[in-house]
Amino acid sequence: MNSLSFLNHEFEAFPSPELALTDPNGLLAIGGDLRPERLLTAYYHGIFPWFNADDPILWWSPDPRAIFIPGQVNISTSLRKYLKKQPWHFTINHAFTDVMAGCAQPRRKQAGTWITHEIQMAYRELHHNGHAHSVEVWHGERLIGGLYGLAIGQVFCGESMFHRETNASKAAMLLLQQHLINMDFKLIDAQVMNPHLESLGAKPVKRANFIQLLTQFRDNTANPAAWIPSEVTLEL
């Protein structure tokens, strides 16, 4: 029978993801902190933090796991036509803090957000250290969509996305896919399946299979040019 682990502020090791609870699905550990070293260790082993503002830090590794293989993100004919008509432009790593703030805004019918101030501060530090990255969608000078996540070797671990204009988050996802293909990334970790991710082409895989893929690609050296702040054209 699997049991929950409790982390302190000194102990960096995580239990094996195989020990995660089945109810709630994937809950592995409680406690610890959000220092860069602990966060990087978590993602390296297929674990991520996810908790509400009033909760302790909760660490997860769900089964199944939602993933994209770069090149398999869906784009319908209607979406392609729609995006071609938009005067939007795209950047990489130009506005990480603003993207996180956009993602942190509560969705409709949601009272709060899991992207707390504590989470934002922790991931800004990861960004400053070259581990966390953002994709931005602009309409003129206005940020209308984007996403952020972490790069672990040739794996991109997506965290959240947002939009302020219709389909802007989908455009950010397509831009991310294009960029990751160009930079020879092999896997996108989307964490937990939901209808929006499924509509974009995410696939559920068993946790053991995800860990196998992660292990295969996490130690590979990424293209050093991958996350230089840049303007990028979305090719449709």
Curated annotation (Swiss-Prot):
Query: What molecular functions are annotated in GO for this chain?
Result: leucyl-tRNA--protein transferase activity
EC numbers on record: 2.3.2.6
Question: Which top EC class is named for this enzyme in its record?
Answer: transferase
Signal peptide feature range: none
Is Cytoplasm one of the keywords UniProt gives this record?
Answer: yes
One of the GO biological process terms: protein catabolic process
Q: Which UniProt keywords apply?
A: Acyltransferase, Cytoplasm, Transferase
Task: Name any GO cellular component annotation.
Answer: cytoplasm
* InterPro entries in alphabetical order: Acyl_CoA_acyltransferase, Leu/Phe-tRNA_Trfase, Leu/Phe-tRNA_Trfase_C, Leu/Phe-tRNA_Trfase_N
- Is-annotated flag, keyword Secreted? no
For this protein, what reaction is catalysed? N-terminal L-lysyl-[protein] + L-leucyl-tRNA(Leu) = N-terminal L-leucyl-L-lysyl-[protein] + tRNA(Leu) + H(+); N-terminal L-arginyl-[protein] + L-leucyl-tRNA(Leu) = N-terminal L-leucyl-L-arginyl-[protein] + tRNA(Leu) + H(+); L-phenylalanyl-tRNA(Phe) + an N-terminal L-alpha-aminoacyl-[protein] = an N-terminal L-phenylalanyl-L-alpha-aminoacyl-[protein] + tRNA(Phe)
For this protein, the record's SUPFAM superfamilies field holds: Acyl-CoA N-acyltransferases (Nat)
The organism sits in which domain of life? Bacteria
Localization in the cell: Cytoplasm
Return the HAMAP family for the record: Leu_Phe_trans
Which PANTHER family did the record assign?
LEUCYL/PHENYLALANYL-TRNA--PROTEIN TRANSFERASE (PTHR30098), LEUCYL_PHENYLALANYL-TRNA--PROTEIN TRANSFERASE (PTHR30098:SF2)
Q: Which family does it belong to?
A: Belongs to the L/F-transferase family.
What the protein does comes down to: Functions in the N-end rule pathway of protein degradation where it conjugates Leu, Phe and, less efficiently, Met from aminoacyl-tRNAs to the N-termini of proteins containing an N-terminal arginine or lysine.
Write the protein's name. Leucyl/phenylalanyl-tRNA--protein transferase
Organism (species): Shewanella sp. (strain MR-7)
